[in-house]
């Protein structure tokens, strides 16, 4: 069962290996690309791979402006900006 809710639950439960296996094998017919990118973003965020997470959230928003990735991306950006203020001041 490779539904959005199923994979989201795997990510929330920290079963990241199984979530990755499910995402790798899922097709766009089963799960739209925007949802796939959102889930990949969550997966990479759980692994603290912020660059990959951001990339996937950006793709999700580009494909679906109403994606929940928009809010997650904004939160991620705010956290990053808060912790790395020096990057904002060249």
Functional labels for PLM-detected ranges:
Residues 31, 64-65:
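Short coil turns that delineate tetratricopeptide repeat
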Residues 70-90:
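Terminal, low-structured helical/coil segments at or just beyond the last alpha-helical repeat
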């Amino acid at each position: 069962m490779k539904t959005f809710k199923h994979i989201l639950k795997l990510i929330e439960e920290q079963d990241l290996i199984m979530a990755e296996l499910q995402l790798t094998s899922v097709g766009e017919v089963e799960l739209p690309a925007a949802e796939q990118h959102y889930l990949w973003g969550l997966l990479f965020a759980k692994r603290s791979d912020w660059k990959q997470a951001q990339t996937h959230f950006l793709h999700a928003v580009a494909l679906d402006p109403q994606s929940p990735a928009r809010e997650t991306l904004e939160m991620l950006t705010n956290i990053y900006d808060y912790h790395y203020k020096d990057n904002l001041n060249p």
